[in-house]
Amino acid sequence: MSDPCNCVETGDCRCADGSCSDCSNCKCGDSCKCSKPNCCGKNVTCKCGENCQCGVGCTGPDSCTCDSGCSCK
């Protein structure tokens, strides 16, 4: 599996697919942690490419991914 992060001089990182633009405090080899505001109306922090919980109140499946902008499917 390829490295999900692209290291830059500032120490921040971006997801290889460019879906995460707010990644920070990420070390090379680690997954970017990004917070998206559009996950069932809640701010959700999850690892890019992995499922995160939208939380209670979601009308539908409560799983979401950073890759899809943390939008419930």
UniProtKB/Swiss-Prot annotation:
Residues that coordinate or bind Cd(2+) 6: 54, 66, 70, 72
Residues binding Cd(2+) 5, per UniProt: 48, 52, 54, 58
Transmembrane intervals: none
Binding-site residues, Cd(2+) 2: 20, 26, 39
GO MF annotation terms: metal ion binding
Keyword annotations: Cadmium, Metal-binding, Metal-thiolate cluster
Task performed by this protein: The metallothioneins are involved in the cellular sequestration of toxic metal ions.
Presence of keyword Metal-binding: yes
Lineage summary: Eukaryota, Metazoa, Spiralia, Lophotrochozoa, Mollusca
Source taxon at top rank: Eukaryota
Record protein name field: Metallothionein
Family according to the record: Belongs to the metallothionein superfamily. Type 2 family.
Residues the entry annotates as binding Cd(2+) 4: 46, 58, 64, 72
Organism: Dreissena polymorpha (Zebra mussel)
Binding site for Cd(2+) 1: 15, 20, 34
InterPro entries: Metalthion_mollusc (IPR001008)
Residue numbers binding Cd(2+) 3: 28, 32, 34
Induction context: By cadmium.
